UniProtKB/Swiss-Prot annotation:
This is Glycine--tRNA ligase beta subunit. Keywords: Aminoacyl-tRNA synthetase, ATP-binding, Cytoplasm, Ligase, Nucleotide-binding, Protein biosynthesis. It catalyses: tRNA(Gly) + glycine + ATP = glycyl-tRNA(Gly) + AMP + diphosphate. The keyword Ligase applies. Its EC number is 6.1.1.14. Belongs to the class-II aminoacyl-tRNA synthetase family.
Amino acid sequence: MSKNLLIELGLEELPAYVVTPSEKQLGERLATFLTENRLSFEDIQTFSTPRRLAVRVSGLAAQQTDLTEDFKGPAKKIALDADGNFSKAAQGFVRGKGLTTDAIEFREVKGEEYVYVTKHEAGKPAKEVLLGVTEVLSAMTFPVSMHWANNSFEYIRPVHTLTVLLDDEALDLDFLDIHSGRVSRGHRFLGKETTITSADSYEDDLRSQFVIADAKERQEMIVEQIKTLEVEQGVQVDIDEDLLNEVLNLVEFPTAFMGSFEAKYLDVPEEVLVTSMKNHQRYFVVRDQEGRLMPNFVSVRNGNDQAIENVIKGNEKVLVARLEDGEFFWREDQKLQIADLVAKLTNVTFHEKIGSLAEHMDRTRVIAASLAKEANLSAEEEAAVDRAAQIYKFDLLTGMVGEFDELQGIMGEKYALLSGEDAAVATAIREHYLPDAAGGALPETKVGAVLALADKLDTLLSFFSVGLIPSGSNDPYALRRATQGIVRILDHFGWRIPMDKLVDSLYDLSFDSLAYTNKADVMNFIRARVDKMMGKAAPKDIREAILASSTFVVPEMLAVAEALVKASHTENYKPAVESLSRAFNLAEKADASVHVDPSLFENEQENTLFAAIQGLTLAGSAAQQLEQVFVLSPVINDFFDNTMVMAEDQALKNNRLAILSDLVSKAKTIAAFNQLNTK
């Protein structure tokens, strides 16, 4: 008869960002534990609040399945001595399996007999196996851990309770400094300690103490309550998904409410108000039916609606203090001069090993000028890039950005416009931070994109030059994100700028502030980001073939990846790749100093292939270029069928290898086809 298992770990308040991943991890680790211990189950449901992580297993087998395993030992000639008795090797083998030599049998494997034993292990009761479930809790990993009291161990937060129930039976075990029981803690203010009656009664037992254990249910409650407020007040609430996920992990019993603030604060830029509400106070933004910001907010209380008016007033008071700061900085910052702020950037450190922000901007300006030409910007756009590069970090010294650092770039755009800067310059100041997250929005203007590329390139080269290179998962300066941004921007705008030549040109630049070094590491790092971009859809062999090509133009590489993936599902892919691979492998033996001499051709196939190569222009899209190469497959095969490439005559051999080298030279601009797998 199957059973239901409940495990709940009661902790001190968890950071909101840890709750959901930890809930998922607990479920996955327990599933692995049960599977490895031969305990079958029907379903696993996980629970979490800021003060608990829990999991319930339904339909858990009452006993492990029996285990029968065959073990292969030494060969028979080693297992038996000259008298036919079992040797020490055979005896040691069976002893290690907990058996005797009586269990030995011989089985033939590839013409030779070997010792085999079969071990039967009866399944243990689930209750006995589950005493080891603390291994699951101990194996949990967290981004941060802590000590408490005088304990030597670490965990995400102090543990207060552990409940492990098999149906309604409490299992007896210890974890850290806690002994298991069936007592759980209710809501910190509204509830009290409560007894969990059984695995099935878990949610109801906690609900009676004002705890909604199911995160999905809490989320549904929050959304439903907000929707009710929308209808009652005739407004629209921005239910930001990230904020919603954070808020539901801050509360155990949610109650949404609406507060307000004076309309005068609406004169402050919307981004300031939204940042104050969303990022600093965890409030949802309220708009009218036309989408205009309203002097209201929605927050979620961790509790019921008792004394809710006092709660609303308290939240309003806290928000007004934030808005007062924003209004003050908005007013005072407009008195500042951009030129004065830029001059002060010489005293702001970019990084202690690299220099000041002003020096970073100087290098960025030079790189931006080069990129603007590579991207074929107009003279007007080039001028905008140059002006933006001179001032684009000035807002870091404004009071607003000092208080709300999330607004860097955003306030720079607004202050630049107020100071009379060109709109393209102002937009570039905002856009140079983009993309600011994996998959985040990209710059929309060419001027902003060029400035973003230049800023990210100098950042990458500067940090690598002083040895601050990411390793493993450690990337404190977000260089992977910056480089991924470079790749995405180049692809988005379709700029066919050869990255290898571009980086070479940057290393030729001379700056008093810093000398770029570690070029090989930089190139490998950029290749890894391109590889990651292709990895979303392309298998490893296709990615490696493209990265080994003679072209390092990001949009083309990504387009070739897509074209090769599509082509790999067609009938002519395998024969085409195989013929090209053969050509690539032989071409490696070619003498680079030898050029094709048609007078040495001995058959029509040499003439035909050479003419086809001469006419190969590789024009059009990546798919079209790929087709232009693939269509040569019959010609290549005909050449191989009728021509001895590695002829004894050295001149003939070198000439034929030179033909293949010419083919490879052109085809390799697409991919190194001998890296592709056709098996």
